[in-house]
């Protein structure tokens, strides 16, 4: 509950029933109380190859790496294996999750993203001689009580104040820069940085001097500095016992660069004199943020200058910008060579390059110039050699990577042209999005030479009814009759260029003969809609019937009562409507009578009357009587025809109940009942406490007038202020108030008083998904499909509104009384505007780009899908499951190998996990321009019915028996002393919206 700030979400019980692991939720604002890393020098990070990290924001895998990567595989991954030694030798993994104390060292893992075909034969891989044995049976076990972290204010400034006494001025020499740069490059957190970023951080390093016995860091105190030893020796003490000694070039404290945590050891100067280079976390992350933001903005601007991409949408341009790779070229180094195969587009970011053909210089390229655009479309050899004249920096993207993040570029460009033309059409603007997509996909693309007669009225056999100009220019002539000669003549009606379309009149009148003459001016490319394509897409030749259907659907989708029906339920309901006509003055419904029908006005006007007094009028596409479908109650008003004739679409309650029934009907009744109830704080009666958290308690309350039960989250204003979480709480309320999805907890309203803020939400009684998967053991494919698909739909809803959830894990998902999921706890959520840089979430579920600090987008949530699916089907967590501290968790996420237990043999599931747990966010499945469509259409979901899930037509894996709530035996994890004098009234009215 509340913002994600260093709460210890739970002590997790392994599904092998005996072992647990602590998982903490982290944010920059407060210390999570996790172990530090003073005992690990930089050498520990040297094991990780720099090239194995996700390169973010223009500093990713080199072009060569991208070229070598097989289709569908993250460039920094090895080729995927299969589920056991006999099938290819993927290392097995134990199903264990131990506490932070006394764990084994983490295994080396490597995240992989496989090709679309998971059943393809993989190359052999080395198999450990003693592969760890997985569990013989499906694990299970009871959950241990959650362990709450002790929260306190962010006092990391204490270390900074102490270090100020040792701060000294030193102008860095070339040797100093070399020492710092080498150490930073070997550091885990910095290993993904480019040369410019390393240089900027080296400049930001401060110089500190110490004498023998001086304390640099103290065990148990919050730390915010990362250090590199310049000279002297320093001892490492744990519990006042010397465990290590460090000298020149060694580094320590790298976890402090990621987030605010307590030091795990004391470091003391042991030589007569010693000196350190140090950088504070805020300086480090702010430097990366500024460099990353500037780099993205520059690359985006360069991309905008490429006319080749001008027909792309802003979202598509952003996707390409994220995928751009930075390449450096020395003077005289060829960038491309004449005659070589070309498949990369280059944009000069700085420097200049010479273009030559056959050894003869043609021209000079400078900043902002680009070349190789045809290489993205056609497999043509390079027509010229381009050589760097001076040190030159380029950003580039290859055809293979572009296909993965955007799709076939030519197809995308043509699709954009068609979408824009259809959106401007008065005919097609009434079509549904899925209908337009089907039309576009079914379009036939053809090339025509110059002066070619494409269509003539006699060419009826072609069946062409509508076309777009994708490239080139053509003329359209209309046939008219000469009054004098009575002969037909052709008269120029229009000249069409790229992006323009023709044929609306033939779409509206499918049987009307084509009566135009169409001829190309020069070579051109057209996209054609034939009569058969239109018929197949519209479901028949009657376009009026299709538009009628679309109108009903658009109206019904806006109504709360019908908003989340499945497509099948929606279609059945619309087909059940009948048209009824009423004459002026005729009563349609009467006040006080039992309602059994729902009406939508097709044409005309009706008057709403109460006690024979007119309240208002309703017109075309307005509706009334919808609650009669759910409730057997008297009509509260009369409705009569107010125009000469009123045509209504009508559906009866009996028909509705045949279409909408069972869990969906019960869900609708509950949601409508909750929406109708006006709740006042004084009408709430506390029944019991159902949970406790960082900022207070969650209580089960009863609304006395209606007997409806709710959950009331009581947030201590004192705690919020003490932890500087005012903005987080405001944002949490704002996001929750906007959410309206069946798989997301519903906020009813908020209250406040002097001591507390209150969130009144629907009551969710089925317990946590975390507990459910422990009861079920390892999930079968159908069970994992159900839960992952439900989570995907909830997060997709948020992402459509540009909201990043940022703390996705089974503990933050509850089950309702039917066993369907409810996403809760929006304390970490953020409305995204550009990129985010804050380290927030639960370490085991964090995406690599969140840890690295160079900016992330909505893609971070998609990584968590992979972690959850792995947990569902494999048992342990994919990364850091056996880690001793958070630094090891982060190291495993950034550099570890993804391996699967021998008992996981579902190749579709393995493939999806690999593609979700891809360290390159732009290549991660679900993160390309296709979005969640790629996830939904993955082979793992090939036999899954998404529509039935939305309509509550699938049986949940676990049907709750009775009511289950979080244990309420623990005390609040944040307690202020009685004499605490925190002022409750802030300088600004931060809680005014409650």
From Swiss-Prot:
Keywords: ATP-binding, Cell membrane, cGMP, cGMP-binding, Cytoplasm, Kinase, Lipoprotein, Magnesium, Membrane, Metal-binding, Myristate, Nucleotide-binding, Palmitate, Serine/threonine-protein kinase, Transferase. It is a peripheral membrane protein. Residues 65-80, 133-162 have a biased composition (Basic and acidic residues). It catalyses: L-seryl-[protein] + ATP = O-phospho-L-seryl-[protein] + ADP + H(+); L-threonyl-[protein] + ATP = O-phospho-L-threonyl-[protein] + ADP + H(+). Changing residue 2 to A: Loss of membrane localization. ATP binds at residues 690-698, 713. Residues 965-976 have a biased composition (Acidic residues). One of its GO terms (cellular component) is cytoplasm. GO terms for molecular function: ATP binding; cAMP-dependent protein kinase activity; cGMP binding; cGMP-dependent protein kinase activity; metal ion binding. Activated by cGMP. The cGMP-binding domains acts cooperatively to activate PKG. Inhibited by the antiparasitic small molecule 4-[2-(4-fluorophenyl)-5-(1-methylpiperidine-4-yl)-1Hpyrrol- 3-yl]pyridine (compound 1). Residues 9-22, 33-46 have a biased composition (Low complexity). A lipid is attached at residue 4 (S-palmitoyl cysteine). This is cGMP-dependent protein kinase. The gene is PKG.
